[in-house]
Amino acid sequence: VRRILPVLIVLLLLPFAAPTRAAAAGTVWHVIRPQESLAYIAGMYDLDPHDLASWNQIPYEAPIQPDGVLRLNPPPAPLPVFSSRIETVSPGMVNWNPAKGCPIIPANLRRVWVTYIDFTGAARDGSVIVRHDVAPRVQRAFETLYRWRFRIMAMAPMRLNMPGETDMSIVTAGYNCRAVAGTKVWSEHAAGTAVDINPLQNPMKRGTFLSPAAGGLYLDRNRRLIGMIHPEGAARAFLWNGFHWGGTWTSLKDYMHFSLTNR
């Protein structure tokens, strides 16, 4: 996380920089807030709304969605059409150890590949592993996030999508054969029925415990920062596909966590 914090600080400040009509270099963007329209945002930055729609490859007349991110300058390359595929996994892919007694076997897991937009605005191919019957729901949710231009910090394979990063707590991911922190109860991740989105920007807080530990910057959920999830924004992509969101819990808050069982 130390390596990425300076980058995050720059990313957080960029939306408040004064962009030109066609910035020649750098990435400048705006995180969409509720009730904002394309024309309203264009007016904020003295831009033509048609240019704004073109740069972000979105229909001019289509409503924009909270938590999405709009470029305020021409992209270096157009975004590709969203694509996704589902693959089987081998025991080695999930570090399978029969002795642990994980609640699901590798044969019932699937790797879901999706196109996503990273924090620099580049399109990448990333994957999450979930239970076989959950995979289509995950595909639909990520397609919606992509269409809304929501950005994801990092997904596997990290050696390609964020080379050199060693802190896996920041990765958007699904299956993980582990217990709920501080208990002996299997996590829904161990069953392949949960996905965590942008953990650093959407931390879990239980009392004074915070995970990831560096997520304190994002505890004020009234802020609108790149990668943050809000109920009227990105959360809906998963809620509409049958998931429950840990951001609505009362005993603790787990803003990254989407599960089918509400656990």
Where are these regions (language model features)?
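Positively charged n-region of N-terminal signal peptides that target proteins for export
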Residues: 1-4
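Bacterial N-terminal signal peptides
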Residues: 6-16
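Primarily a LysM-type cell-wall glycan-binding module
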Residues: 22-48, 68
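Second-shell loop/turn segments in exported
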Residues: 29, 37-41, 123-132, 183, ...
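N-terminal module-boundary/linker segments of secreted carbohydrate-active enzymes
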Residues: 43-46, 50, 75-122
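Surface-exposed patches in mature extracellular/periplasmic domains of secreted proteins
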Residues: 60, 149-160, 186, 245-251
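Active-site acidic/histidine clusters and adjacent loop/turn architecture
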Residues: 104-167
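Catalytic cores and adjacent binding grooves of peptidoglycan-active enzymes
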Residues: 179-186, 191-263
